[in-house]
Amino acid sequence: MFNRAVSRLSRKRPPSDIHDSDGSSSSSHQTPKSTAKWASSLENLLEDPEGVKRFREFLKKEFSEENVLFWLACEDFKKTQDKKQMQEKAKEIYMTFLSSKASSQVNVEGQSRLNEKILEEPHPLMFQKLQDQIFNLMKYDSYSRFLKSDLFLKHKRTEEEDEESPDAQTAAKRASRIYNT
């Protein structure tokens, strides 16, 4: 269940089609580059499925992927309405990230850890304090390193090259029409 939720949250959404008045696609009217959006805030990065994917790749190399996985699981948990599902997800989050035997234990302050008994009566914000701790850990530690990482910079360069490419193709098309080649 947890893996499905993370997969769903980090799945890439299809880009919007942006067209000129003549119906042709135009790169000059597109939204800001994803890397610029990611660099503006951790919140923006976490709202973008491709950003989450790249951030996870980076965190995996740093052996701290559990932080973003925990954050995503908490986001999914907050959206859960069914009481039974909420109870199952709460236990899964606890067993995966918070218990002393957790397979992907996150680093939260000892007094912030939840008592297993609270899992019997879950509520949407029960993990909020812990999620905020992990968010701040990522924001002030991993995120700044991610923005300087080869992985991010390579993606940024690729994005810039792709942005230049359509203009060059458009110029070539115009030249071929002018010179009938």
UniProtKB/Swiss-Prot annotation:
Q: Which Pfam families match?
A: RGS (PF00615)
Subunit field text: Interacts with GNAZ, GNAI1 and GNAI3. Associates specifically with the activated, GTP-bound forms of GNAZ and GNAI3.
- Ranges for domain RGS come to 41-156
Does the record bear Zinc in its keywords? no
From the UniProt entry, list the residue stretches annotated as the region Disordered: 1-40, 157-181
Q: Where is the composition biased (Polar residues)?
A: 29-40
What processes in GO biological process is this protein linked to?
A: G protein-coupled acetylcholine receptor signaling pathway; negative regulation of signal transduction; positive regulation of GTPase activity; regulation of G protein-coupled receptor signaling pathway
- Where mainly found? cytoplasm
Lipidation positions, renumbered (S-palmitoyl cysteine): 74
Query: Which GO terms of the molecular function aspect are on file?
Result: G-protein alpha-subunit binding; GTPase activator activity
As for subcellular location, the record says: Cytoplasm, Cytosol; Nucleus
Name by which UniProt lists this protein: Regulator of G-protein signaling 10
Q: Which Gene3D superfamilies match?
A: 1.10.196.10, Regulator of G-protein Signalling 4, domain 2 (1.10.167.10)
- Where Phosphoserine occurs along the chain? 24, 41, 176
Q: Which CDD domains match?
A: RGS_RGS10
List the PANTHER family: REGULATOR OF G-PROTEIN SIGNALING LOCO
